[in-house]
Amino acid sequence: MRNYLNINAINKNDVLHLIQRALALKSGEQPKTKSITAVNLFFENSTRTHSSFQMAENQLNWKQIQIDPQTSSMTKGESLVDTLKTLKAIGVDVAVIRHSQNSWYENVLRSEGHAIPQLVNAGDGSGQHPSQSLLDLVTIYQEFGHFEGLKVRIIGDLAHSRVARSNAEILNKLGATVTFSGPKDWQPVDFDSFGEHVDLDVGWSEQDVVMFLRVQHERITHTENQNFSAKKYHEVYGLTESRYENLKENSIIMHPAPVNRDVEIADDLVEAPKSRIFDQMTNGVYARMAILEYVTE
């Protein structure tokens, strides 16, 4: 039994094994079913991640408990640690948690006393999104069969994106060349170690993967929201018809979703032939099945 909190804390061989396992499950291989009870605890809104984990748990024949933090004893002041100890005491084996606090799991892991369930990080603030990273890796590997030498451009709201951070680091480890584009004010300083920040159209036609990120209005400042122009952003940092036409023949378009149509990606291009956005969602179920098997081995 183990946790799944940060994909970059997992060794390369285990990451590749998880990718292969997800693809095997997708091709029809039978899952490793066990008598497991999981709780899904989401402190932030979610459609894809939440429902995808529920679907993965169903496919594994797990029992599920759904808890809304807004109607739980945490509104009375109970800590996350004590909530998890309570859930373990009543028989919960795995807790899938999304939280607005970066690295929420660090305080939990430092706790002493009664046991807690195995932990799966379903996203922590602007920190990490390890299950999204895995499904993105599955999607890229399914397309190209390798990572070494691939050119990947990550575009958009880098500062507030847990997806960008998780993906940039793991793709570097797997041998891809990562570059970034987007507003300079949304370029974290520590991203310099993962790749170069360039104007969007520089080297555009050489990219194998172009990964767009949602503008996270809920995390940017009030002033930034007031000054934001969707039309201007799309012209400078978005996937326009002309940029689509200038992509390599075998390149793919990705986005963790939800997509702001006509902001990050032109409406007509969200489901264009090069788009793998809905394939990512499909792969998310199998990637999360592989993760849930992994934490209960």
Curated annotation (Swiss-Prot):
Q: Look up the record and name the pathway of this protein.
A: Pyrimidine metabolism; UMP biosynthesis via de novo pathway; (S)-dihydroorotate from bicarbonate: step 2/3
Top EC category: transferase
- Which Gene3D superfamilies does UniProt cross-reference here? Aspartate/ornithine carbamoyltransferase (3.40.50.1370)
The residues that hold L-aspartate are 76, 162, 214
Query: So what EC number does this one have?
Result: 2.1.3.2
Any one of the GO BP annotations: 'de novo' UMP biosynthetic process
NCBIfam families given for it?
A: asp_carb_tr, PRK00856.1
Q: What does this protein do?
A: Catalyzes the condensation of carbamoyl phosphate and aspartate to form carbamoyl aspartate and inorganic phosphate, the committed step in the de novo pyrimidine nucleotide biosynthesis pathway.
Share what the entry says about its subunit structure, partners included.
Heterododecamer (2C3:3R2) of six catalytic PyrB chains organized as two trimers (C3), and six regulatory PyrI chains organized as three dimers (R2).
Q: Which PANTHER family match?
A: ASPARTATE CARBAMOYLTRANSFERASE, ORNITHINE CARBAMOYLTRANSFERASE, MITOCHONDRIAL
- Similarity comment: Belongs to the aspartate/ornithine carbamoyltransferase superfamily. ATCase family.
Which protein, by its recorded name, is this?
A: Aspartate carbamoyltransferase catalytic subunit
What organism does this protein naturally occur in? Leuconostoc mesenteroides subsp. mesenteroides (strain ATCC 8293 / DSM 20343 / BCRC 11652 / CCM 1803 / JCM 6124 / NCDO 523 / NBRC 100496 / NCIMB 8023 / NCTC 12954 / NRRL B-1118 / 37Y)
Name the gene for this chain: pyrB
